[in-house]
């Protein structure tokens, strides 16, 4: 499972990086955000490992092996997204300045804003993956991904890609802190809906037993 999480994590990071590339390349942000969905579509359909999709499912059925797989998969995600960032900057040098402006705005917004934005992204990522896993529909992916992008919510793996591209203009050490904050926010957001769902079901069962 750890091997699968690592290599599948790299594959997911690459796909997220490709999604980030098309988003940065589009002048029309609605079009770019919609096309970004190709990343999660491929990840879900091919069964790759994406931390932001797995963390919410983990809290539903936690186990030791999955707990070890999460950081391994996240490392793979970061490697894949980072390598894609370097490759995209080589193929499309104009993206560097675009990414730098975006990342400068992220850092200027502060860590608290980044954390809250990442929580909202985590909620939408869980919703997208859960609806695909339980209902077999891609509707959640097609709508949730553009929604978090157009809202300006923070996806930690996508941020690895954006900050990697931006670093080719100028590296800011605070970008690493920002990404870690985004990971924390995505984790909290990914846990929120399953925890609330569990509490709701527990309440219903308690009422039914009376």
Task: Indicate residue ranges for each PLM-predicted region.
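Alpha-helical transmembrane segments and their helix-helix packing motifs
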Residues: 1-210
């Amino acid at each position: 499972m750890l091997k699968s999480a690592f290599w599948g994590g790299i594959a997911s990071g690459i796909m997220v990086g490709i999604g980030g590339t098309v988003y940065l390349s589009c002048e029309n942000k609605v079009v770019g955000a919609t096309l970004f969905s190709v990343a999660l579509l491929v990840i879900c359909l091919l069964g790759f490992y994406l931390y932001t999709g797995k963390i919410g499912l983990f809290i539903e059925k936690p186990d030791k092996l999955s707990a070890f797989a999460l950081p391994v998969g996240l490392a793979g995600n970061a490697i894949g997204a980072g390598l894609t960032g370097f490759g995209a900057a080589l193929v499309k040098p104009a993206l560097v300045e675009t990414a730098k402006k975006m990342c400068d705005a992220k850092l200027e917004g502060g860590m608290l804003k980044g954390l809250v934005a990442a929580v909202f992204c985590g909620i939408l990522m869980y919703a997208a993956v859960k609806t695909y896993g339980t209902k077999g529909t891609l509707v959640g992916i097609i709508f949730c991904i553009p929604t978090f992008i157009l809202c300006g919510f923070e996806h930690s793996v996508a941020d690895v890609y954006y900050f990697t591209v931006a670093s080719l203009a100028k590296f800011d050490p605070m970008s690493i802190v920002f990404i870690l904050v985004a990971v924390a926010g995505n984790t909290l957001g990914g846990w929120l809906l399953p925890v609330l769902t569990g509490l709701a079901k527990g309440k219903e069962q308690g009422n039914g037993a009376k």
